[in-house]
Amino acid sequence: MKGARVVALCDKNQEQFTAPTAGGNISGADTATDYGDAAIYDDFDAMLAEAKPDVISLTLPTPLHVPLTIKALQAGVSVLCEKPMALTAAECDKMLKAAHRAPNGAKLMVAHCLRFWPCYVYLKKLVDSKKYGNVVAASFRRFSAPPGWQKGTNWFADESKSGGVALDLHIHDTDMVNFLFGMPKAVTSTAAFDKNGAMQYISTLYDVGGPAVT
């Protein structure tokens, strides 16, 4: 990003900063990243107080989004928070209230990345311009193995912590429906579960008052 500078990084697991960055469901480098002169922390409060960042990118497990987002906003630091925003609507409301009250004009943005991918930006232009006419139907499909962001941990497999397939993965499609067609008038979902009760598949019909969207 032009004009931006990474001033600090923070992680309880300091090995994250010396190990190769490949992993998860997005390919990365096979060698350790050079973070230049960025300060390295293992304490979030210390980072806020000493590094005094203007903006932080919060890429932590979902249960940590609420407390650390609120803490940063209260310190006047803007937050780009990984999706999903939180596990419940009540928790989201807490984050929004903190953003409205934040000093220094600090802002909160949830990182729904697809809105900024070139192919989706182009799709949005086509829908809005009606270059090929009105959309009469739309279908989105998404397949993914569970990400392995942190080896040796299983928080993602615990739906009470991650939200599972519906909240962590399907949320991409829900966001794109809102982005392209606006807030649905009604939503109907069906799901399939494995023998342990974990959701493996979800299908949703969105009534947007126009095209049929699944």
What would you call each of these model-derived segments?
Residues 105-106, 114-190, 195:
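Predominantly a Rossmann-like dinucleotide-binding segment in NAD(P)-dependent oxidoreductases
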